[in-house]
Amino acid sequence: MAQPASPRGVGLVGPSTLLIRFLSFCITENHPDVMTNPLPDALLSYARRTVVVTGAATGMGAETVALLLETGAEVHALDIAEVTTPVTSAQHVDLGDPASIDGVLDDLPPRIDALMHCAGIPGGTRFDPRTVVRVNFLGLRHLTEAVFDRMGDDASITSIASLAGGGWPGHRTEIFELLATDDFVAGDAWLDGRDDLVGDGYSFSKECVQFWTMWRSTSAIRSGVRVNAICPGVTDTKIMVDFRQAMGDAAIDMTADAGIGRLASPTEMAPAMLFLGHHQAASYINGVNLDIDGGFMAALTTGQVDFSKYNLGS
């Protein structure tokens, strides 16, 4: 089967792929015996792997799709926006509507090697809190359970959570209750009367994604499916304006400055999605929420953030 054309050029030529090639060269140059080990090939290829990606049209999802195509994957894209990348199939879906999700199931492949949840919407003024939770968590869960039987040994589910979801320990009991609901509709009904818990929807929805990742990983691995998530820090996507409105410039700037000193790029998130989703490179990684924040949480945890530099009340 001919490989799809890469949006970054022809074949395996993207910057992330070149980095992986270089690392593999260094490994084999210094340790020739590793040539008998499958790891170098594992780092280079998604060939013959079928991957479903939500939120594939823009931002981190689009970068994930681009890198998957560079590494040989068969990509099936889902998004409410038009997907222009040359994927195997692209379906319009609203993850905030279970009927919309159910409507595309017949168009998805019978076997799915990796499911990558990249769709998400911000809190703030553009979306009401219930819609945010529906899209960011309830839809994610609904799609996962709807296609789970199509996944088997060596399959993976990888989601984009957020550093903003790190408050889940304070809401463990409530999140357990939400996870106990049977389906999308029951989960949505559970939100009734819990406006204080839900807030603007974003942090709570990402708390749910983080906790669900750990919770679902234990049962999923019995079927050979690993479940992980990445937790990006402040990332320069088109919804950054929403985060600045919701959190304030000072909080965004502090999160960026305390680590590497700049916002992340969506291109810096895609390689982590591919790594965690890979059946060989990450074969023993399960139930992990991986912070990708330029070192912000390390600085915060060790008391190295100078809060006095920022007017966090503004």
Predicted regions: what is each one?
Residues 40-75:
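Canonical Rossmann dinucleotide-binding motif of NAD(H)/NADP(H)-dependent dehydrogenases/reductases
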Residues 121-125, 153-222, 234:
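Catalytic loop of short-chain dehydrogenase/reductase
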Residues 258-269:
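A conserved structural motif in NAD(P)-dependent oxidoreductases
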Residues 231-242, 298:
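Short, flexible catalytic-loop segment of classical short-chain dehydrogenase/reductase
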Residues 23, 27-50:
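Flexible N-terminal pre-Rossmann segment of NAD(P)-dependent oxidoreductases
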Residues 226, 285-287:
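Short, small/polar-rich loop/turn modules that mediate ligand/substrate recognition or access, typified
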